[in-house]
Regions:
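Conserved, structured core segments of small domains
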Residues: 1-118
């Protein structure tokens, strides 16, 4: 079985940990990567798309309606945010009083990203 693990936390809390503890936690991430886990994190900026009336509307914040459960996910490759908005505007959740939250993905397995964080 594979699991999608949605991790919640803040950069502020991460940075408040002692460096030794951060290193230990990053070592655990490396163990997961060696086991073949696909690991990623979302950037803090978010775009929510709604097309309730057939026309895409966007907001630069998460979908506030907590009564709507997570129904699914997709990883979409696109040239830019406008292309993604156009692609998801016609999906069931965007049209049926739900929303699609769009966040750029940072691939943690990418060596360039790991070098950037050092």
């Amino acid at each position: 079985m594979k699991f999608l693990c949605l991790a919640y936390g803040t950069e502020k809390d991460w940075r408040s940990l002692p460096r030794a503890e951060q290193d230990a936690l990053l070592a655990q991430d490396e163990i997961l990567r060696q086991r073949g886990a696909l690991m990623g994190a979302v950037e803090p900026n978010v775009t929510t798309v709604q097309a309730w009336n057939g026309k895409p509307e966007t907001a630069k914040e998460p979908f506030p309606q907590l009564s709507a459960p997570l129904a699914g996910f997709a990883i979409i490759e696109a040239e830019n945010l406008d292309e993604v908005v156009a692609l998801v505007a016609e999906t069931p959740c965007a049209r049926a009083k739900g929303a699609i939250e769009v966040r750029p993905i940072m691939i943690l397995n990418d060596k360039e990203w790991r070098n950037f964080k050092k």
